[in-house]
Amino acid sequence: MRPLILLSNDDGYSAPGLTAVRDELARHADVVVCAPAVNQSATSHSLSLHRVLRLLEAAPGVFAVDGTPADCIYVALHAGTRVLPRRPDLVVSGMNHGLNLGADIFYSGTVAAAREGALRGVPSIALSADAGASLPAAAALGVKLALALHRAAGQEGRRPAPLLNVNIPAGSSWPVRATRMGARLYTEEVIFRRDPRGHEYLWIGGAGVRHDLVPGSDTEAYDAGAVSVTPLTLDLFAAQHEGIAGLLAAELNDGPIP
């Protein structure tokens, strides 16, 4: 039986990156797309709990949800056979138009879709490519990595489900590195403007980017022109701060903190 792969993204169900990955995956697996109806970049792992959602079958095996990437994976995995004929063997998110390096993973809808899959026990991989990358080459490499993850996860029966974040730099041929999260720092800005009626509005974010040196990191790999494959954890417990939590608990148990 061919593996069943659930494919999503945050750029929208008709995005070129998703189409390229879908076409490449379809050579090796059965693919069902469940992706946002419109661009949902930087929506992180939000779920739409306070409004109705719409599910549209845009084409056979291609579903659009008017919600976030995490909504899409949630709907696909919990809607019975409305979307998927059975439980998928793998969740693939991407190919994202743009990178998700370092702390980008906390904002990325692409990574969040994969994370939602892993939270539900399905091996998952997020794929992102630099705007200067050859999309056919990036899709081919991303699919090779996705299928390798499927084989490795199936053989080892890993629990919890593995979650990988892949970033592909500009170009069409790359070495591949196993990496850790790096440090990607942006020029933070709040830009205020006024509309034609005199009402104030603002834009947040900044265009300038620099990478701090973190040996063995995804940012280091990107700067060297290599593909980064970064395993992510669903357990956010910070052992290095366990002592602080213990101190606060002890002080509260002994009496109010002065």
Curated annotation (Swiss-Prot):
Record's cofactor remark: Binds 1 divalent metal cation per subunit.
Catalytic reaction list: a ribonucleoside 5'-phosphate + H2O = a ribonucleoside + phosphate
GO cellular component entries: cytoplasm
Keywords: Cytoplasm, Hydrolase, Metal-binding, Nucleotide-binding
Major location (coarse): cytoplasm
EC number(s) from the headed UniProt entry: 3.1.3.5
Pfam families: SurE
Signal peptide: none
A GO MF term: metal ion binding
Cofactor names: a divalent metal cation
Cystine pairs: none
Binding site for a divalent metal cation: 10-11, 41, 96
Classification via Gene3D superfamilies: Survival protein SurE-like phosphatase/nucleotidase (3.40.1210.10)
Localization per record: Cytoplasm
Family: Belongs to the SurE nucleotidase family.
HAMAP family: SurE
Role according to the record: Nucleotidase that shows phosphatase activity on nucleoside 5'-monophosphates.
Name under which the protein is recorded: 5'-nucleotidase SurE
Lineage: Bacteria, Pseudomonadati, Myxococcota, Polyangia, Polyangiales
